[in-house]
C-alpha cells in the first residue's frame, strides 16, 4: 500500500485594495451593468504599488507554514505557478524560499501555464514527498491581473496567492 500524501497546511493572501466594475467601465466608455451581470462581479482585488506575485506568495507561504505547524527550513521544494512573475530572469521561487527560511537545500522553480501552473507545482511537490525525496514540499499559485485594456479579463482577473504545504503526516486533505 502506498503512503498517502496530501495537504498539511494552506494559506492565502488577497490584497485589500479593490476596484469596482463601474470604474473600469467608465474608463473605456463601456456598459458596467452588462459586465456586472455577465461576469457576476462587482469588484476585483488589485495590489498596491509595492506588491507583486512575489510579495503575495510570501504572505500566503507564511500562512501555510503556520497552519501546517512547521518551520520553513523543512520545505524541500517550492514551485510557484504564475502568469505574472515580476522578473524575466530571476525566479520568484528563490526570493520566496529565502523569505520563509527554506534555503539552502530547497529545490525551486517557477512554472508558467495560465491557470494550471499552481496546481502543477502542487503535483510535483506531492510526487517528491511520495517518492521519499523530501519530507514537505510547497506549491504556490499567485497572479496579478494581466488583462488587456478593455478586455473582459481587465474586469475579472484580480490579484492573490494561495500556498499549499504537501506532506504525508497530519493531512488536512488528500
Segments from the language model and where they lie:
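Short acidic, glycine/serine/threonine-rich loops at helix termini
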Residues: 18-19, 89-92, 123, 148-154
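Phosphate/pyrophosphate-binding loops at sites that engage ATP/ADP/AMP, CoA/4′-phosphopantetheine
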Residues: 60-76
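Conserved catalytic cysteine-centered active-site region
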Residues: 34-52, 83-137
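Condensing-enzyme catalytic core mediating Claisen C-C bond formation in acyl metabolism
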Residues: 1-50, 154-174
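Buried hydrophobic positions in well-ordered alpha/beta secondary-structure cores of metabolic enzymes
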Residues: 7-9, 35, 64, 78, ...
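Acidic, glycine-rich active-site loops and adjacent beta-strand->loop/helix elements
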Residues: 13, 81-87, 113-118, 141-146, ...
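Beta-strand segments within the central parallel beta-sheet cores of soluble alpha/beta enzyme folds
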Residues: 73-81, 107-110, 135-142, 174
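Flexible, glycine-rich active-site loops centered on histidine and acidic residues
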Residues: 130-164, 169
Amino acid at each position: 500500500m502506498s503512503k498517502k500524501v496530501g495537504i498539511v497546511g494552506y494559506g492565502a493572501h488577497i490584497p485589500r485594495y479593490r476596484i469596482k466594475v463601474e470604474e473600469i467601465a467608465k474608463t473605456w466608455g463601456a456598459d458596467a451593468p452588462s459586465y456586472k451581470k455577465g461576469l457576476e462581479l462587482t469588484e476585483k482585488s488589485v495590489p498596491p504599488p509595492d506588491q507583486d506575485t512575489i510579495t503575495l506568495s510570501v504572505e500566503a507561504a507564511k500562512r501555510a507554514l503556520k497552519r501546517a505547524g512547521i518551520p520553513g527550513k523543512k520545505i524541500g521544494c517550492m514551485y510557484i505557478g504564475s502568469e505574472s512573475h515580476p522578473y524575466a530572469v530571476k525566479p520568484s521561487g528563490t526570493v520566496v524560499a529565502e523569505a520563509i527560511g527554506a534555503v539552502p537545500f530547497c529545490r525551486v522553480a517557477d512554472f508558467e501555464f495560465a491557470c494550471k501552473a499552481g496546481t502543477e507545482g502542487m503535483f510535483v511537490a506531492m510526487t517528491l514527498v511520495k517518492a521519499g525525496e523530501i519530507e514537505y514540499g510547497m506549491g504556490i499559485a499567485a497572479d496579478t491581473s494581466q488583462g488587456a485594456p478593455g478586455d473582459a479579463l481587465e474586469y475579472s482577473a484580480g490579484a492573490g496567492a494561495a500556498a499549499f504545504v504537501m506532506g504525508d503526516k497530519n493531512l488536512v486533505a488528500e
